[in-house]
Regions:
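Glycine-rich phosphate-binding loops of nucleotide-dependent enzymes
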Residues: 1-268
């Protein structure tokens, strides 16, 4: 079953086609990567899915429901969360407070409850804090809840951003270059973490990533974009051997060196 399905999605900026007739299907509880050179349209596609951009043509479906043109908050309410290439934490808030921000769509206490601070509001706040600390433990950040996010190491800030995305209880999680700026050890930890999101929480993952080691190591299916067009789609093994992909993105040397990487990462 497809969690996400796009049909001939086209997005233009002036006279430039940032996306042209993109068909993409993301299967339930899969890890699906989107790769391509800078400017290929990867983040533009994410922005169309999440409602930040409205495509000029085509449709996007989430669990069979047409979400084309819905506002970002409506898409979030329907169970889509996202992280960004550049970390967007609230630097002067604690780790727990950052996660509470991500829970906002699901909190029932409104403005009046917040002002009166009645019993129901207090109970909901207590439950929310407990859930935030549970998410921190799941993300390997136990004991860090009361630290300012700006004081966490870079890799932990990445995981905190993921924890905040999980606070929305998503069934589709969009990750935009989750290993950007990480050292090899942090990258390996993030790869295992992404697998856990799928295996333990049943979350479907749509991933943008430039590190081919990561893409080949965790993806079940890979879609390749170039100049806003889909030029290939297939398994890691198929993508490595695709001449158009090699020419447009990987380069002959990169492609020839990926087989051993894929094997070692798949068994890690």
């Amino acid at each position: 079953m497809a969690v996400l399905f796009s049909k001939k999605v086209t997005k233009r900026f002036g006279g430039l086609n940032a996306l042209s007739n993109i068909d993409l299907e993301v299967k339930e509880q899969s890890i699906h990567s989107v790769i391509g050179p800078n400017g290929a349209g990867k983040t533009t596609f994410f922005n169309c899915v999440t409602g930040f951009y409205i495509p000029e043509e085509g449709e996007i479906f989430l669990d069979g429901r047409n979400i084309t043109g819905l506002s970002p908050d409506r898409v979030t309410h329907l169970g889509v969360s996202r992280t960004y290439q550049n970390i967007r934490l609230f630097k002067n808030m604690t780790a727990v407070e950052n996660i509470l921000v991500g829970m906002h769509p699901h909190l029932k206490s409104g403005l009046v409850g917040g002002i009166l601070h009645d019993r129901r509001t207090m109970r909901e706040e207590s439950d929310a804090v407990a859930e935030a600390r549970r998410l921190l433990r799941f993300c390997g950040l136990q004991g860090k809840g009361d630290l300012m996010s700006k004081n966490l190491p870079y890799g932990e800030q990445r995981r905190l951003e993921a924890a905040r995305a999980l606070a929305n209880k998503p069934h589709l999680l969009l990750l935009d270059e989750p290993t950007a700026g990480m050292n090899p050890s942090e990258t390996h930890e993030m790869m295992n973490f992404i697998r856990r999101l799928r295996d333990e929480l049943g979350i479907t993952i749509l991933l943008i990533e430039h590190q081919m080691r990561v893409v080949m190591g965790i993806s079940e299916l890979i879609t390749v974009l170039d100049f806003g067009e889909k030029i290939a789609e297939g398994t890691p093994a198929q993508i490595q051997k695709n001449p158009r992909v090699i020419e447009a993105y990987l380069g002959q040397g990169a492609a020839s060196g990926l087989s051993s990487t894929m094997t070692s990462d798949a068994t890690a």
